[in-house]
């Protein structure tokens, strides 16, 4: 059991965001990403109403990577719940029979959505904003589960610096790899609040160029923190040298 972005939509009074880009409203979860192991048969997440005065409704559901609501593989229980001021409630994620149809050799990505609904107001000319957030939910089959005390390592991600200074990440692992930092001296080159996700057994390129031959990357780990690596690329279009950085937070 382990304790994940870029959807920002303002429409019909709904603000949808990710954990990294816009602060949560009254309702907050106990983590920023969700890992569901097949052997656990399910997972639980706690929601807390931070408001000291107002009750809120919290609506939860699962979406696939195309933004379609799905109850075929995982469902949330309860799908709607009331949280009184300062109250904490547990939401369960339960697998369905069709979960057996998912690939056994790699992770499958879903999104856990939570929408907070404030109480109605009697005041006139007041627009209420409903906060909606999506957390990455990674379904991890038994064949690739980590031990309880296991820590993900990222040496199998091949890094190549190309002629124009852009970086290619070849993910040779069965896990989704998300980069939350690419840069030097603590200054990231990633656009503000954005990350770069590489699908299992796939690759992704940076949109920015002119990356120096020596830099650092920070992978977002299972716990939502960053695991840092030192990257040294003595030549272009060849694999760079990768070593664990001294810091890991």
Segments (PLM) and residue ranges:
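Beta-sheet-dominated interaction scaffolds and their linkers
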Residues: 24-48, 147-161
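N-terminal targeting signals for Sec/Tat export/insertion, comprising classic cleavable signal peptides
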Residues: 32-70
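Intrinsically disordered, low-complexity Pro/Gly/Ser/Thr-rich segments with frequent PxxP/GP/PP motifs
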Residues: 71-100, 188-214
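Terminal connector regions
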Residues: 98-144, 214-249
């Amino acid at each position: 059991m382990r304790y994940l972005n870029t959807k920002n939509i303002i429409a019909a009074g709904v603000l949808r965001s990710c954990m990294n880009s816009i602060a949560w409203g009254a309702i907050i979860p106990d983590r920023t990403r969700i890992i569901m192991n097949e052997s656990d048969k399910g997972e639980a997440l706690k929601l807390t109403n931070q408001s000291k005065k107002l009750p809120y409704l919290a609506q939860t559901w699962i979406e696939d990577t195309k933004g379609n609501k799905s109850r075929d593989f995982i469902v949330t229980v309860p799908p709607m719940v009331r949280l009184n001021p300062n109250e904490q409630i547990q939401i369960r994620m339960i697998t369905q029979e069709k979960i057996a149809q998912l690939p056994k050799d790699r992770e499958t990505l879903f999104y856990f959505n939570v929408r907070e609904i404030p109480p109605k107001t009697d005041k006139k000319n007041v627009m209420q904003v409903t906060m909606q957030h999506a957390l990455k939910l990674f379904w991890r089959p038994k064949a690739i589960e980590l031990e309880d005390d296991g820590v993900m390592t990222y040496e199998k991600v091949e890094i190549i610096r190309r002629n124009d200074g852009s970086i290619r990440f070849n993910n040779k692992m069965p896990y989704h790899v998300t980069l939350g930092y690419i840069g030097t001296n603590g200054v990231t080159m990633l656009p503000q609040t954005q990350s770069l996700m590489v699908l299992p057994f796939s690759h992704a390129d940076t949109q920015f160029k002119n990356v120096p031959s020596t830099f650092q990357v920070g992978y977002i780990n299972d716990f939502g923190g960053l695991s840092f690596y030192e990257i040294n690329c003595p030549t272009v279009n060849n694999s760079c040298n990768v070593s664990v950085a001294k810091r890991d937070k």
